[in-house]
Regions:
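Structural signal for the C-terminal ends of transmembrane alpha-helices
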Residues: 90-98, 157-166
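Hydrophobic cores of alpha-helical transmembrane segments in multi-pass inner/ER membrane proteins
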Residues: 82-88, 145-161
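Interfacial helix-loop-helix junctions of multi-pass membrane proteins
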Residues: 12-22, 119-140
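Interfacial segments of alpha-helical transmembrane regions
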Residues: 1-2, 101-111, 169-184
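Short aromatic-rich membrane-water interface segments that cap or initiate transmembrane helices
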Residues: 33-34, 65-77, 134-146
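Individual transmembrane alpha-helix segments
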Residues: 46-84
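Long, glycine/tryptophan/cysteine-rich extracytoplasmic
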Residues: 28-51
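N-terminal signal-anchor transmembrane alpha helix
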Residues: 1-31, 184
Length: 184
């Protein structure tokens, strides 16, 4: 569900032209948004130094900036949350030796795909922080396609875990699982 939410928020970020509002990429320290007027003005001044503000959004107010900043911030925070929701159980199950070799390979690939998405996202944003303040459509397509591939591969890994022979006899559990999968 988080991957789906991430893709939807990414789409909203694109449609609201919010993706270039956060001009710095701090993997760990960037988790805290501006919390007071001074910090908001600092973030806005950083944005003002880039061509998107100078050439397109030069009439943008601090209030409007906060709106576009929100969508990009939310997109990045869901990415961080997704990473934590994945990595913590992954490490736990590795330590407890609860994953077979096939699942270790599959989940390691998922981990790499998730990390790659973050890198591709920043690569895409960097393409718009130049003289031509618009992200590369090619990089955007790569970002979206790899998101879909990650989503599909996640299902490919998870479905055999959900629909095992042991669980197929429990019709209530199977029905609930199908409903849950539809909700995702």
């Amino acid at each position: 569900a988080l991957i789906f939410i991430m893709v939807v928020i990414g789409g909203i970020t694109r449609l609201t032209d919010s993706g270039l509002s956060m001009v710095k990429w701090n993997l760990f320290m960037g988790a805290i948004p501006p919390l007071n007027e001074t910090e908001w003005k600092e973030a806005f001044n950083l944005y003002k130094a880039y061509p998107e503000y100078q050439k397109i959004n030069f009439n943008c107010t601090l209030s409007e900036f906060k709106y576009i900043y929100f969508w990009e911030y939310l997109h990045r925070m869901i990415g961080r949350l997704l990473g934590l929701v994945f990595i913590i159980p992954f490490i736990y199950f590795l330590i407890k030796k609860r994953l077979n070799k096939k699942l270790i390979v599959q989940t390691s690939i998922l981990l790499l795909m998730g990390a790659m998405q973050g890198a591709i996202g920043w690569w895409m944003v960097k393409s718009g922080l130049v003289n031509n303040p618009d992200v590369s459509h090619y990089r955007l397509a790569v970002h979206l396609i790899t998101a879909f591939l990650t989503f599909a591969f996640t299902f490919w890994v998870v479905l055999p875990l959900i629909f095992t022979k042991e669980r197929s006899g429990n019709t209530v559990l199977l029905g609930l699982t199908k409903i849950l999968m539809l909700l995702i």
